């Protein structure tokens, strides 16, 4: 049987609709109700998960993902959904992520496999067995604790210089978390994690549900496919960084059962898989600056296939080797990525600074500048900044500077 065919543009529209980026955010008049918990839930239902990142070049990256979909919202409401209402929980999914609490059993194999393939801290961790159990007992008795609340093991240097874990107590907590013996109760004001027993965080219906490795992977990939809309096996697997060798058989089973539809996308070398419930809009009218960690663009090979857009996040690239800038964000207008801007918040001056602005080939300069200027003003206001300043670098800088002053 011949596979259904999609054009690149049709696939792009499906992908944007799957992420809730196919429509402009509602205009909110001054004094109108800001986006609330319901709006956040709807956006998260589209993305499925948020990859957590607390880099503060332009606010927190994962919070920006929601801003792109619902506009200026109170980030405390996201914390409320995750850490007080317990609708989401932190897990290692796509790196450190916020996932629906119902995904707890789906990530069970990943937690179990951490015991087989642990970090380099494993040898030290095994030597600290008594200390590890005391930590768990202390949390059981005292409630949620962070690394700063714990003493170091006797005779062991507390600090772990040169590692992101920074201290032995933190490394122990993080290892217990990755193995599923602890869960994140909340984030403190400094964004450090406080840990508790998972049975006090995850509802019994999810905590006690145990799935085989195959069933867990299959169900997890089904959720990933909804977020992707249409994509190759690699696109779907990357949504939660699942090894492709584990993902392919389960995706094939989903296709065999009718949970996914095999399609051919023009210009793609591999077959694609379509979520049968995906919306297939005839027209897309998006308008959003996208975080580097946005699910719509985080897998760069797929981004290139869908949008003909070459994107590299250059925050870790030496300055002299950067092409676009330290924190360049793609700008979605309509159904194209039409520009990219290198941004930086300057709290002291109350300014959102555009260090560079680049227009993509064939994009209408004046229209893009006007729409982007409005988006930058909205973003600046959400970040608590008073102004937008555009520097001279980039082929869109002059038009954008003029538009921001208009």
Regions found by a protein language model. Give the residues of each.
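Long, low-complexity intrinsically disordered regions
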Residues: 1-297, 302, 309-328, 333-406
